[in-house]
A protein has these predicted regions:
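Rhodanese-like catalytic fold shared by cysteine-dependent sulfurtransferases
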Residues: 1-17, 21-22, 29-62, 66-121
Length: 121
């Protein structure tokens, strides 16, 4: 069964509505870590424990960086299998950015503090 898709225009309308969907960032590790932006309000989930925390009473839109939506379709299909109302964003974040739609700055990855004495010359 194919995963339902949502266009960037429809998602923008939904984000501007009173009940926006939950946005899930499903980009693979490299594209995610080498990007400075994300869709407004997007959350990153890793693993089943994280998906269990998603609200079941809201629609979920999953996106990735692949214009063919491979990762987002896989994640959306799994969420649907678990009983969520999920769709994949057509064209992923690339199409969203190409249309100059709003984004948020992504938090920089957390880095461990240097070991004591590591900065001594």
């Amino acid at each position: 069964m194919p995963v339902p898709r949502i266009s960037r225009e429809d998602l923008k309308q939904r984000l501007d509505s009173g009940t926006p969907p939950v946005i899930v960032d499903a980009r693979l590790k490299y594209p995610y870590e080498h990007s400075t932006v994300k869709l407004p309000g997007a959350i990153r989930v890793n693993g089943q424990a994280a998906t269990a925390a998603l609200p079941r009473d809201r629609d979920i839109v999953v996106y990735d960086s692949d214009p063919n939506e491979v990762a987002s379709s896989t994640v959306a299909a799994e969420l649907i299998r678990q009983g969520y109302r999920a769709v994949a964003l057509k064209g992923g974040i690339s199409e969203w950015l190409a249309a100059n739609l709003p984004t948020e700055t992504k938090e920089a990855p957390k880095q461990a503090p240097p070991e004591p004495g590591a900065l001594k010359g």
